[in-house]
Amino acid sequence: EHRYRANLAAKGPQVKLGNDHEYAKALENLIVKKRYSPSAALAAIRNGKKSFRTSICPRTLYNYIANGVLACEKKDLPLKGKQKRRNRSRKEQIQKRVSCGTSIEYRPAEVDHRVSFGHWEMDTVYTSKKDRLKPTLLVLTERCSRQEMIIRMRDRTSGSVVRALNALERSMGAAKFSKVFQTITVDNGSEFSDFEGMEKSALRKRKARTKVYYCHAHRSYERGSNENANKLIRRHFPKGTDLSKVSVQQVAMVETWINDYPRRILGWKTSNMIFRPWFDRQ
């Protein structure tokens, strides 16, 4: 427990942390308990209200971790490096177009360029690709702020997706939902096959609540924000996690963690810092 205290003393005055044990403890807590990357941990401290005597850069923090100065190790850090590509069979590569919805080619340029709020990407995180009847997470990522909404569904079917959006619309109200969810971009998975059900308002008869666009097959980069968000979710629910044993409360905690996580692409601000002021004005 006191190993890094001894390491601090052994390193001598050249260790910038010096005797600022409170700062060291705050960094350890963010990295080990809250699962932040070193850069995100430093940003969270800068964004916070509490001030410390010391301030270090990411490279210094990584060196401290590598040299055992702090009570955290490399295993506490997010995995880095490229993952091995799976050698997919021909059967896996063929993805049938399951909808007659609107192609991403017709999506407005302002959505592509992320110049305005209200445009989302949607995906699912699940336990088994083969079993569509197991509990699934519906993941929505706002393209401008990277704000995350995660909804636990009973299965990975188009009916459950429509029901989840209906519940979200009822909780917000029809007018606010239409402002917040102006467009939603999805892949060609069968859970997103009911584009009419997803677009149609549950509260206003014969009126649309959003516009759904479909990506090209095998182009996950067209939902890049979704893909990155899914990696953050997998820090908490690794592949193979039985989502039937994951509670709604646990899902909500992960959603909050993601939205409070400082991101490099946001200038080390959090999604909540960027999204909430806009959302509250709608």
Each language-model region and where it sits:
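Acidic/histidine-rich, metal-coordinating catalytic segments
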Residues: 175-194, 216-218
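Mobile genetic element proteins and their domesticated derivatives, centered on retroelements
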Residues: 27, 41, 61, 123, ...
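Charged alpha-helix within mobile-element recombinases
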Residues: 21-34, 45, 170, 189, ...
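Basic, flexible linker segments flanking DNA-binding modules
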Residues: 53-112
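Active-site beta-loop-alpha junctions of metal-dependent nucleic acid enzymes
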Residues: 130-133, 150-175
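An active-site-proximal beta-strand-loop segment
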Residues: 106-149
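DNA-recognition alpha helix
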Residues: 38-52
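Short, basic alpha-helical/linker "hinge" immediately adjacent to a nucleic-acid-recognition surface
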Residues: 1-33
